[in-house]
Structure formats: structure tokens, C-alpha cells
UniProtKB/Swiss-Prot annotation:
It is an enzyme of class 3 (hydrolase). CDD domains: Rap1. Residues 182-184 form a propeptide. Its EC number is 3.6.5.2. A lipid is attached at C181 (S-geranylgeranyl cysteine). GO terms for molecular function: GDP binding; GTP binding; GTPase activity. It comes from Homo sapiens. GO terms for biological process: cellular response to cAMP; negative regulation of synaptic vesicle exocytosis; Rap protein signal transduction. This is Ras-related protein Rap-1b-like protein.
Length: 184
């Protein structure tokens, strides 16, 4: 079974843990409890393939920056999450993306831009078009709006990253047995 290392990044309070826990455990975490770093393993089926996802739920961008390079180096796919209710969380993502590309030393990194808390439409300050435009600027990066509370597009975030990783590095075919031939 193929393993995937996915990293959830964004400012504090955008709902990174809520999205991850909703995906892995199917529950919504109401209480805000700042994360230092949590790791989850979840077996899922994506496009008829069994996959083991290792999901790293990270601290807000302002904290524990020393650890960030390490999980950017080891991660294969990245969910960059902002809250549609806080413009600053959207603005923070540009630097985060640039850091990922610098650490990975490539522009071709499986990534999805996620506008979270779309159930709070009355409190929206970041328009959907802003997210779509930023995703376009980022080499047509995938983009979704989600809500951990209302279970909107939660699974799709992680499944999309798996599909991007599969497109970038297809599963190798079954290795052929090496045979040897001896002439006498």
C-alpha cells in the first residue's frame, strides 16, 4: 500500500486541526486548542487504490518556525489553509508557499489552497474570487472552500492531494523478476 505524507499549513485559528480531525475521526472539534504538532495516520481508498495517509497537522505559521523546514522537506503534498473570515490568514499564505517551493527546490509541488469556514458566510471577508485568483497565480493550484463544521469538501482536500501526488509520481509497475541465463 502506498503511503502519502500530507502537511496541513496555515495561520493559527484557521481550522487546520478541525479539518484534519473531521477527516480522520469524523468529529468536529468546537474548542480551540492551539496545536504544536499532531500526526495522524488514516487508511483510505482513492480511485480504487488503498492509500495510507500520514497527515501532519502543524502549529500556526507564527509559531515553531524552526520545525517548518523539516516537515516541508519530508511532505509530499500540502494543504494551505486560510479562514474566509480573516484577511490576514489569506495574506500569510504567499510567504508559506514560497518557503515550500524554496525547500523543495521546484515549482511543481502537490498543493491545494483551502478557504475554510465557508459555513460562516455572514462573517466572510475573503471572497471566493480572491481564492480562485490566488490559485490561478500559483500555477493553477487546486482550490476549494471547506467547512469542518458542516463537513463541506473535507475529504476532497486530502483526496485531491493524493491524486496530485499520483500524477506527479505514478505508482511504479510491479517489478519484474530478474532472471539470469547461463550458457554452458
Amino acid at each position: 500500500m502506498r503511503e502519502y505524507k500530507l502537511v496541513v499549513l496555515g495561520s493559527r485559528g484557521v481550522g487546520k486541526s478541525a479539518l484534519t480531525v473531521q477527516f480522520v475521526q469524523g468529529i468536529f472539534v468546537e474548542k480551540y486548542d492551539p496545536t504544536i504538532e499532531d500526526s495522524y495516520r488514516e487508511q483510505v481508498e482513492v480511485d480504487a487504490q488503498q492509500c495510507m495517509l500520514e497527515i501532519l497537522d502543524t502549529a500556526g505559521t507564527e509559531q515553531f518556525t524552526a520545525m517548518r523546514d523539516l516537515y516541508m522537506k519530508n511532505g509530499q503534498g500540502f494543504a494551505l489553509v486560510y479562514s474566509i473570515t480573516a484577511q490576514s490568514t489569506f495574506n500569510d499564505l504567499q510567504d508559506l508557499r514560497e518557503q515550500i517551493l524554496r525547500v523543495k527546490d521546484t515549482d511543481d509541488v502537490p498543493m491545494i489552497l483551502v478557504g475554510n469556514k465557508c459555513d460562516l458566510e455572514d462573517e466572510r471577508v475573503v471572497g471566493k474570487e480572491q481564492g480562485q485568483n490566488l490559485a490561478r497565480q500559483w500555477n493553477n493550484c487546486a482550490f476549494l472552500e471547506s467547512s469542518a463544521k458542516s463537513k463541506i469538501n473535507v475529504n476532497e482536500i486530502f483526496y485531491d492531494l493524493v491524486r496530485q501526488i499520483n500524477r506527479k509520481t505514478p505508482v511504479p509497475g510491479k517489478a519484474r523478476k530478474k532472471s539470469s541465463c547461463q550458457l554452458l
